[in-house]
């Protein structure tokens, strides 16, 4: 199960003051932001796949250039930051169940942190983005 499914199950079944958690304003705001982050990250993931899969022929080799790498790394940087934030908020909502290894939220959070460090980390992604968007040559 992924983050959305675990969080949906938790806020739909747990109650606080005779109301399910998802009906409280504070929790609804947090889970609404998490749902938006998940949706935006999914769309950007498809966009990155489409950018990286451009070909000059239907079955030719992908066209990879510095511009493509810069755009994909920029998307990776943004999406991994939003995912870490979403997992942190979800662990806050889940309370003591958030870091519990039986719920797998903590494992997914660790995996996202590894993805954040993958391909050189945040600074390298920012330098690639600056190189692409602002034509920096000395970075």
Model features per residue range: what roles?
Residues 1-139:
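Alpha-helical interface subdomain recognition
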């Amino acid at each position: 199960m992924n983050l959305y499914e675990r969080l949906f199950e938790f806020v739909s079944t747990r109650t606080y003051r005779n109301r399910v958690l998802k009906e409280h304003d504070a929790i609804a705001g947090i889970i609404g932001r998490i749902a938006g982050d998940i949706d935006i990250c999914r769309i950007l993931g498809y966009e990155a796949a489409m950018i990286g899969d451009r070909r000059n022929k239907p079955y030719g080799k992908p066209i990879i250039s510095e511009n493509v790498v810069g755009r994909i790394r920029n998307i990776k940087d943004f999406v991994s930051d939003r995912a870490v934030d979403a997992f942190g908020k979800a662990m806050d909502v889940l309370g003591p169940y958030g870091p519990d290894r039986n719920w797998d939220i903590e494992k997914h959070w660790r995996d996202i942190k590894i993805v954040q460090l993958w391909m050189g980390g945040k600074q390298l992604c920012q330098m690639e983005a600056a190189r692409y968007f602002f034509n920096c040559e000395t970075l």
